[in-house]
């Protein structure tokens, strides 16, 4: 089961007050519902491929409208994966339900935006967002390369209204048009965890945070290892270059031709090619030399070798 599916399953098990049940139901029906007229009677089908969400819709309708007759049907998809499709159907009193949820007005006028009457309380704003996520939401697993949570809407007006509702909780949500509709999305991991908290997905929130922290720790360790590796490669590369230059000088003019301080370091570097500059300085018999002092002498040796390669006579290139 995907992280999004696990999160939705958790949400379908939450207990809610009547006002919040109404708000959540309004989002689910607005986003997943379809209307039909049969024998001059308005009917409502709410469709989903998620059995837990279908049961949630059925339960919420019976809670908010206990006297209404509701059917829960199962159909088999005939195309592609042939998954089950679940229908929550109202053949009667659909108009009453839709008006009560502020989805339609008089004359069957459909309201595309979220009614303030439905989300007047903070708890109901949270519940509407929960219903919207159940109906059209998705969330990346926190292990993936990028954090992303989105809610899909067919209609631009509802998408704008939904984005405003999310941002009433300072979630920094943004809107985007898609090929077949519109989305409101969040990219920041901290805001995604806030959203999960708002809609009541606390187990999903804890899992998301655990994975995110471990992921950040791994990334920090990897950056540190990469940095250490780069430094090591740089050190090894410098040591190999120094040895190569010292051997070149030995072949061309002999190490005895070097000033005493340079010769000491040159001979030590040839004998101890894998030690650090600090360790090399501690091996000087005439007295310890600092890391910067060793580095200075080796630079002089490098410069001398480069001058000799360029054809500068040894006498004029010898450091004083």
From Swiss-Prot:
Disulfide bonds: none annotated. Residues 276-310 bind DNA. Coiled coil: none annotated. Belongs to the WhiA family. Keywords: Cell cycle, Cell division, DNA-binding. This is Probable cell division protein WhiA. GO terms for biological process: cell division; regulation of sporulation. Involved in cell division and chromosome segregation. The keyword Cell cycle applies. It comes from the Bacteria. GO terms for molecular function: DNA binding. It comes from Halalkalibacterium halodurans (strain ATCC BAA-125 / DSM 18197 / FERM 7344 / JCM 9153 / C-125).
């Amino acid at each position: 089961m995907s992280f999004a599916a696990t999160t939705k399953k958790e949400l379908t098990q939450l207990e809610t007050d009547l006002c919040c049940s109404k708000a959540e139901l309004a989002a689910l029906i607005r986003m997943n519902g379809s209307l039909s007229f049969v024998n001059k009677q308005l009917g409502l089908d709410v469709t989903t491929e998620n059995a837990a969400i279908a049961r949630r819709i059925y339960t919420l309708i019976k809670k908010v409208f206990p006297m209404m007759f509701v059917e829960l049907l199962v159909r088999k998809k005939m195309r592609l994966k042939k998954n089950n499709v679940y229908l929550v159907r109202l053949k009667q009193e659909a108009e009453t339900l839709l008006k009560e949820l502020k989805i339609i007005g008089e004359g069957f006028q459909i309201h595309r935006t979220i009614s303030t009457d439905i989300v007047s309380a903070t708890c109901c704003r949270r519940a509407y967002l929960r219903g919207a996520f159940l109906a059209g939401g998705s969330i990346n697993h926190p292990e993936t390369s990028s954090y992303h949570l989105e809610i899909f809407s067919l209609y631009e007006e509802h998408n704008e209204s939904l984005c405003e509702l999310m941002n009433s909780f300072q979630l920094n949500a943004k809107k985007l048009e898609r090929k077949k509709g519109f989305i409101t999305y969040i990219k920041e991991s901290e805001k995604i965890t806030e959203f999960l908290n708002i809609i009541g997905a606390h187990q999903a929130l804890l899992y998301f945070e655990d994975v995110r922290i471990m992921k950040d720790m791994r990334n920090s360790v990897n950056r540190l290892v990469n940095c250490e590796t780069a430094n090591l490669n740089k050190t090894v590369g410098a040591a190999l270059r120094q040895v190569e230059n010292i051997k070149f000088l030995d072949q061309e003019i002999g190490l005895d031709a070097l000033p005493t301080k340079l010769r000491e370091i040159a001979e030590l570097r040839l004998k101890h090619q894998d030690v650090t500059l600090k360790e090399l300085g501690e091996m000087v018999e005439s007295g310890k030399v600092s890391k910067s002092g060793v580095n200075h002498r080796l630079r002089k040796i490098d410069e001398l070798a480069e001058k000799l390669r360029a054809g500068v006579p040894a006498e004029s290139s010898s450091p004083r």
